[in-house]
Amino acid sequence: MKESFKGLCNLNEDELKALLENSKTSIVIDTEVLLMLFQMEEKNSSELLDILESEWMSDKLWMPYDVGFSFMCNVNSYIVRERQLINNARKQLENFHDNVINMKSNPYLKDDVLANFKDTFDKIKTSFDSDINALDLELEKNTKKERIDKIFSQDKVGVNYTDAQLSELFRRGGERYGKKMPPGMDNGNTNERERYRDYIIWKEMQGFASYYKRN
């Protein structure tokens, strides 16, 4: 039964190892994974980029054109949005800090507890400031984006569809979305390329796997 429904069954450890070691296996990284690099702690994002840069992984990586297209269109706004989220959290923390400090005359707020609170506040605030500075630096220096660009060199990126091909994909995507057939979900985006992005990427992956006989 498992042979008939491979797509619905998890691979065991040996099967997964065999798949990863197969020279015909390609690994596709989605746009969201690339964007998350700008949300992670610097240590974690650097480690993930190190893995993607490793010779073993690099040989297997391939990027559908629309993954790269979506990443390039959204990465700067994503960084700005992350910066704003951190800044908002920082302001809320400062407001909470001020409210607590104003209660210092409360007899139940002991000096040692207040001191611990101030210490914790300073550590969290420093962490927020560090994250904001890292995002500002990324917008200025493009360090991570340059590493991603080198990882996905031109030969590892798919070819853009023609306007005629895109029109046909939009039509088919609309039919599937109307029937609630995955991949993808109708998010109401008026930009058809974004609206049918998951479907377009799926079709490009199918074409790549079929043409190059890849897993």
Task: List each language-model region with its residue ranges.
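Active-site-proximal, substrate-binding regions of enzyme catalytic domains
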Residues: 2-214
